[in-house]
């Protein structure tokens, strides 16, 4: 039993009429299809045993047809909505019987056959409205012309249709196990483990199956078709063609779509525009959805999730031969809350050392005296930049990235409490010093210029000395220079390890100290000082460090500089 493949014949008919006589009934039936716009407007034909994809414009029905030529034929029709719910119905019209013509085999005249079909309204066999993957199955269907009509009243949408007259042997969709649920077997703050029972299509029928897991924060999906439509909703090539952009109105009329002004307004048809402007108009934001195809494993751990967040999980069994899929019953779960951290209390005017793990977070609290006009936060980030947020009684006052030394002064409020949130670097662990005070005094950390690099003068380099310069500020500070011999293969990794700006001169050997001096300049543009480091060995590499000392004894280190003396002089 076959579904009639009319779409091939429709294209070949004009050529065949000239060179070869088609069977009489088929030829007349095809001609009737072409002329009968009431029945076959924008029509398509469903092939037997193949899944087809289609696109619906909102409120514009689409019809598919197939012929069952013998009675008592098994029949299965499956419709898969993608982007939006569908309304669809399946109707049957009996085919006109061929007259014997006194044994001549001549059929009834074409007009009589056509009139019989047109006069028959057909019998509705099944109808459905929703976004589920829905089936029509019959073990014994009568012969006749079957019409599948689909419409989307919500929005333009994709869909899939599959029909077969041999449902027992085809089975292109994987079969679900007796318990088709997806179970959550393990739950953490950033990970969730899922498990499900294998499909009999793999374990019993030995067909190649792979499982695809889909994770998102919105809802469960009922088909891979719906997942893929959501994932690529912002791709221009997936958008429905629009008159004036992809087709002109004549093309649309040719394909069976109305092209009058009212229809254009309903679908927001636009005049001809440039491709770049068109892409800006139709581009949608990307959806937060992930899809993993994991082979034939039926256990999967999802990682890198956010704490205290609800996620929806779906599993699809995919036939590797037909690429057709079946959805398990999805589930949802909320990750555990972030472990509540102990909040450190800051004492007024005292420097506190803070260590933060990679990508970690620390919370500090500051409760100044009840009556205060201003609050000052001084932060010294020892390694990479860190993020700081300050809230006063829940209201966000400050959100900044801090590298080096920064000072923030905020307006106070009687009896206010301040919560400080510190977020570490993605590169590695973070270290910092922080001071909070409601008193007006000198900050604990010395002021720094914007550029904390040390410059070496190559032309002034000798076999036993190196001349360097660095910037200062308008504030009088004490600067100390230290030197350390390093190997020629001293790498950036070693340099990074030595770049902790919070380690002061007290961690250095006395033999490494070169000198200390005071320096400042009222003219910020002339705040430059130079120094010649002597007593070096020929052809050797040295790491030079400059420390600037604060009023409270806290120091800040400039960026280290590697210099190499001349080997021959």
UniProtKB/Swiss-Prot annotation:
Keywords: Glycoprotein, Neurogenesis, Repeat, Secreted, Signal. It comes from the Eukaryota. Residues 1-19 form the signal peptide. This is Protein NDNF. GO terms for cellular component: extracellular matrix; extracellular region. Secretory protein that plays a role in various cellular processes. Acts as a chemorepellent acting on gonadotropin-releasing hormone (GnRH) expressing neurons regulating their migration to the hypothalamus. Also promotes neuron migration, growth and survival as well as neurite outgrowth and is involved in the development of the olfactory system. May also act through the regulation of growth factors activity and downstream signaling. Also regulates extracellular matrix assembly and cell adhesiveness. Residues 261-332, 446-565 form the Fibronectin type-III domain. InterPro entries: FN3_dom, FN3_sf, Ig-like_fold, NDNF, NDNF_C, NDNF_Fn(III)_1, NDNF_N. One of its GO terms (molecular function) is glycosaminoglycan binding. The keyword Signal applies. GO terms for biological process: cellular response to fibroblast growth factor stimulus; extracellular matrix organization; gonadotrophin-releasing hormone neuronal migration to the hypothalamus; negative regulation of neuron apoptotic process; neuron migration; positive regulation of cell-substrate adhesion; positive regulation of neuron projection development. It comes from Xenopus laevis. The keyword Magnesium does not apply. Glycans are attached at residue 323. It is found in: Secreted.
């Amino acid at each position: 039993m076959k579904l009639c493949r009319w779409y091939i014949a429709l294209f070949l008919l004009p050529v065949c009429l000239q060179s070869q006589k088609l069977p009489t009934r088929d030829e007349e039936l095809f001609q009737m299809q072409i002329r009968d716009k009431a029945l076959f407007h924008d029509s398509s034909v469903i092939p037997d045993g193949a899944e087809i994809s289609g696109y619906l414009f909102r409120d514009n029905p689409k019809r598919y047809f197939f012929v069952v030529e013998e009675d008592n034929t098994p029949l299965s029709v499956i419709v898969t909505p993608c982007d939006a719910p569908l309304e669809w119905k399946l109707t049957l019209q009996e085919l006109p019987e061929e007259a014997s013509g006194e044994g001549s085999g001549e059929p009834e005249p074409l007009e009589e056959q056509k009139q019989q079909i047109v006069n028959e309204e057909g019998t509705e066999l099944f109808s459905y409205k929703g976004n589920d993957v829905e089936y029509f199955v019959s073990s014994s269907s009568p012969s006749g012309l079957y019409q599948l009509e689909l419409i989307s009243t919500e929005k333009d949408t994709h869909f899939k249709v599959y029909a077969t007259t041999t449902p027992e042997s085809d089975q292109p969709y994987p079969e679900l196990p007796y318990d088709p649920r997806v179970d959550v077997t393990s739950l953490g703050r950033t990970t969730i483990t899922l498990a499900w029972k294998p499909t009999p299509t793999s374990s019993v029928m030995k067909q190649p199956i792979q499982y695809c897991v889909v994770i998102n924060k919105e809802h469960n999906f009922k088909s891979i078709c719906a997942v893929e439509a959501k994932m690529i909703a912002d791709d221009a090539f997936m958008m429905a063609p629009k008159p004036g952009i992809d087709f002109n109105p004549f093309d649309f009329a040719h394909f069976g779509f109305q092209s009058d002004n009212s229809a254009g307004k309903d679908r927001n048809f636009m005049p001809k525009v440039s491709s770049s402007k068109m892409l800006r108009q139709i581009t949608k934001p990307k959806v937060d959805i992930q899809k993993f195809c994991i082979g034939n494993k039926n256990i999967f751990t999802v990682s890198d999730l956010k704490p205290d967040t609800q996620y929806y999980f779906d599993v699809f069994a995919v036939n590797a031969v037909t690429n057709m899929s079946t959805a398990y019953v999805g589930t949802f779960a909320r990750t555990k809350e972030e472990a509540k951290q102990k909040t450190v209390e800051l004492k007024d005017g005292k420097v506190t050392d803070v260590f933060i793990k990679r990508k970690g977070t620390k919370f500090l609290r500051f409760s100044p005296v009840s009556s205060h006009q201003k609050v000052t936060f001084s932060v010294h980030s020892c390694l990479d930049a860190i993020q700081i947020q300050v809230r006063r009684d829940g209201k966000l006052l400050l959100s900044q990235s801090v590298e080096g030394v920064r000072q923030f002064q905020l307006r106070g409020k009687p009896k206010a409490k301040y919560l400080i949130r510190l977020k570490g670097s993605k590169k590695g662990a973070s270290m910092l010093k922080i001071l909070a005070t409601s008193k007006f005094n000198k900050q604990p950390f010395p002021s720094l210029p914007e550029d904390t690099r040390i410059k070496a003068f190559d032309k002034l380099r000798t076999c036993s000395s190196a001349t360097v310069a660095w910037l200062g500020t308008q504030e009088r500070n004490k600067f100390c220079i230290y030197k350390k011999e390093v190997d020629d293969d001293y790498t950036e990794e070693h340099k990074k390890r030595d770049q902790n700006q919070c380690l002061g001169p007290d961690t250095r050997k006395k033999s490494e100290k070169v000198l200390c001096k005071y320096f400042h300049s009222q003219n910020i543009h002339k705040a430059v000082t130079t120094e010649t480091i002597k007593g070096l060995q020929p052809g050797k590499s040295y790491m030079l460090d400059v420390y600037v000392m604060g009023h409270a004894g806290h120091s800040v280190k400039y960026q280290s500089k590697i210099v190499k003396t001349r080997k021959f002089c």
